[in-house]
Structures are given as structure tokens and as C-alpha cells.
Amino acid sequence: RRSGLKVECRVKGFADFGAVEWVLNFKNLSDANSATIEQVKVVDLNLTSPGEGGFTVHYADGSHVSKADFHQRTKVLAPGDSLYMAPEGGRSSQNAFPFFNIEAPDGRGAMVAVGWSGTWFADVAAGTKGGVALSAGQKNLSAYLYPSEAIRTPSVCLLFWQGENRFAGHNAFRRFILAHHTRKIDGKPARYPVSTSFNYGDPAPCNEYTCLTTDYAIALIRRYEQFDIVPEVFWLDAGWYEQAADYKNQKNWANTVGNWKVDRERFPDGLKPVADEVHRVGAKFMVWFEPERVVKGSQWAVEHPEWMVDVGADQYLFDLGNPEAREWMCDYIGDFIEQSGIDYYRQDFNMEPAWFWAKNDEPGRAGIREIRHIEGLYAFWDYLLE
């Protein structure tokens, strides 16, 4: 009996680096809800080696918001040992890192990358007779699909290497990313620019986030010009929007996101005059945004409550999984960037989305909210690059 469920694996190989990457897509072609899709392992394979000794996994912690962020870790897998990795809170590098190196005892190995800006998992388990089993995918998925509904999984990339030590793999993977997954400008990999902020420090509350004005920003730009130290980019950080400067009423940059209108008391003509001055001295202009998090009572929350994913907290998650909401966000931020003369878009995300997804999943459809949000996030970024 046919289930009506179509499973497609899109694969791309890179012969110049001995690498391969793929992603799975599921689509329900039937007229009824599909059976439950769960325990999906986008990669599920065994790695073996003729060498003596155990396999070693080189990995990193991810971010703990500490000085030890992305600390390097190494685990030698004895027979029966395993290493399970997964981020916390719904952000892909929170307490775990989706890139790691499996080193065999014979001078070979595989670099592994899991492409998913949500909650992924990866497991490396050593067998009792040698070799290791590798599996990875979306951590929380147990859902049926509606008729004609389709979803994608995380992607996986494997790069096989051979050399004296693990650094052969690290360096090969770095070159691979530069060659095939780095944005090109005039045929060359885009470089991170040397940038500076408009922050002039404390005493709080008068710092960039509350007291910066058009006049002060322009004066600061001219000061850099005077001393011939103009950077490649001037970076305007958080707090340029309405209510962020109202510290007398306990407002600040963090509890006013969702008010994506320029504070006209500090920037009476918007951000364009600042951008014009930045461009006059030969630099580019970068501006900070955090569109996924929306504080209750803010502009976006009031104007579009139907697009707010709610868990009863003091903030919402913007519903990027809603095509209408995503299209509106694309137009709003895209128009703002063009009208304000912004060259570089900087995106932040200061919340854990996992519980917003989980609490708003329909019964029997765990993981769908996460998938739709990540798909929408990628579509939004694609729009900005067009």
C-alpha cells in the first residue's frame, strides 16, 4: 500500500574537496493526513578505519555567554562510548556547535556540518568492534503532514580528509567554505570590514543606546576623518528606534524591540543624514536589527497581533512561518534599508525560540513550527540578498 509520502534527497558533490552535502524533503501527495514522520536521521552511516585505536571527535562547546564560548573539546571514543550534541533554547550554537571533526586512527577523518538554524542533534557512537556510527537531524520532529504539505530537514555536509592530524581537516574545510559557501564580490570572497561603533561609553544611561543623536554621530564621523582613521564601516548598534531612550520610564534598547521606527527626537530626519555623512568620508553604514523578537506593546505587536507567536511572556516571536507576515517583514525592512542609505544589515536574536515553537505546535505536529520559522528566516535572508 502506497502512503502517498514523497521523500526527496537533494545531493551536491564537490570533487575538488572530497565533500558532499544533502538535504531531505518530504511531501504528502495524498488526499489525507500522512502517517507520523519522526526520528528522521538526515545522515545515518558508519565510518570505519583499518588503523588501530579509537576514533576521536574534535568539537566545540558553542556559546554559554562567557569567556569560554566555543571552547575546543576533544573526546576519544572507546568501544561503546558515544558523544551526543544538541543546542539548547532553539538557537543553533547555544551550548553546542554544529561543526565537528571525526578523526580516525589512521590519519584520515571527516568534517561534519549540520545546516540548521534551530535545534539540531548529532550523535557519534563507537561500536564494540571498531568504527563509529554517525547520525544527525532535527532534534524535535514527530509530525504528520496535511495533504499537499511539504517540509525540509536540516542539511548535512561531509568533507573527507587525509593528513598528519586534525588540522588537515580543519584547513580543508575552511578552504571549502571560502570556495563554495562564501559570498563573492567581484569574484573574490567578501571580507569582513574593519568597523567602529558610535558608542562613547558610560556613564549610563547616556551611551549610544539612549543618547546618540544625528549631530553627535556626524561629529564623531568627522573626528575620525580629522585624524585620518576612517574605518571601512560605521556601525550603528541597538537603540535608534522609538522609546529606547526613555530611560526615565525604565525603557531601554532591549525592552522596546518591535518599535522599528526611528526615534525622531534624536534623529529628526531619520538615519539618512548619518548615512550620507558616512558615505561622504568613503565608508559604509551598518545598522542593527532584531526583527524576530517583538516586545508586547511595541509597534509591530499592536499593529499585527495576528502575527505574534505567544507563550504568555512579555515578548512575542514574530511568525516567520506565516507567508503573509514574512512578506510584510521583507517589504518593511527592505524599504527601510533602501530609504535610510544602509549598506550592511546586522541581525541579532536575544531570546530562546524553542518554547514558542513547542507551545504553539498543533497536536501531533511537533517540530512543524520550528521548520516553518527556519524556512521563513532563510527566505527573508534570501530576499535581502536579492
What do these predicted regions represent?
Residues 143-162:
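Short Pro-Gly-centered flexible turn/kink motifs
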Residues 154, 191-196, 232-236, 285-289, ...:
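Hydrophobic faces of well-ordered beta-strands that scaffold small-molecule active sites
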Residues 218-233, 238-284, 291-293, 298-303, ...:
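Catalytic cores of extracellular degradative/oxidative enzymes
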